[in-house]
């Protein structure tokens, strides 16, 4: 889509040689090593079942009751609009424990893909924000938590590198969107945006934020 290629190399001569190719218009630095690396996220222990006090008696939506009421989602559910037949891709930085949390076990997850380099050695052991996003849409656990689209199908796509902020992440995001399109996704949920980077010269100005 961007008519571009993301290349990783420690050889500066490679960059020089690439710019000599007739079909290469330009080359820019997309990633700079950060001064420090944060400690990897570690998955916390997850209980196989909920505690009795986790349930909210009297309302099948549980802890999600107020938010779905606010969005007037209950009448939609009552008329059958629960996301059935829709495929949703979630683009995020990680989906920690999404494969073990009880109220997420009934979600129809079609697959996962990791677009961050290097790829995670454990897809479900990264940051938890994507798990929260998945839960508010897809959770199906009556009287504990029911999301807004519990009958939809989902792709979980990791494209955010939490160790650094660089323009390379824009390419990770674009690759994830291209993948989502290729597998027939109907809706993309992306909680990501890019403006300020570790290399300040790469940061976008306000005027560049044109959508």
Explain the meaning of each model-derived region.
Residues 50-56, 122, 203-210:
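Surface-exposed intrinsically disordered loops and tails
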Residues 1-68, 74-77:
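Autoinhibitory propeptides
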Residues 11, 66-69, 126-130, 166-173, ...:
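Solvent-exposed, acidic/flexible segments
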Residues 17, 36-39, 98-100, 197-201:
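Extracytoplasmic/secreted cell-surface and envelope-processing proteins
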Residues 26, 64, 74-169, 183-186, ...:
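Subtilisin-like serine protease catalytic core
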Residues 12-15, 21-24, 73, 130, ...:
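Extracytoplasmic/secreted envelope proteins and their assembly/folding machinery
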Residues 6, 109-112, 184-186, 204-211:
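Short, intrinsically disordered, charge-balanced linker/junction segments flanking boundaries
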Residues 177-207:
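Short acidic, glycine-rich surface-loop motifs adjacent to enzyme active sites
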């Amino acid at each position: 889509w961007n008519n571009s290629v993301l290349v990783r190399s420690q050889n500066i001569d490679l960059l020089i040689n690439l710019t000599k190719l007739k079909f290469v218009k330009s080359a820019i630095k997309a990633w700079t090593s950060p001064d420090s690396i944060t400690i990897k996220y570690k998955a916390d222990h997850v209980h196989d079942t909920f505690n009795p006090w986790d349930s909210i008696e009297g309302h099948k939506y549980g802890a999600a009751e107020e938010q779905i009421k606010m969005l007037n989602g209950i009448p939609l559910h009552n008329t059958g609009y629960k996301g059935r037949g829709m495929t949703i891709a979630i683009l995020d930085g990680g989906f920690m424990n999404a494969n073990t949390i009880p109220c997420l076990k009934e979600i129809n997850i079609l697959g996962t893909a990791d677009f961050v380099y290097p790829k995670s050695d454990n897809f479900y052991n990264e940051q938890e924000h994507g798990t929260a996003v998945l839960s508010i849409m897809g959770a199906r656990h009556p009287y504990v938590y029911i999301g807004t689209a519990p009958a939809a199908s989902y792709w979980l796509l990791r494209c955010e590198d939490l160790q650094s902020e660089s323009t390379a992440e824009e390419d990770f995001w674009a690759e994830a969107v291209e993948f989502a399109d290729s597998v027939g996704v109907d809706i993309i949920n992306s909680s990501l945006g890019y403006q300020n980077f570790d290399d300040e010269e790469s940061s976008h100005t306000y005027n560049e934020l044109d959508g």
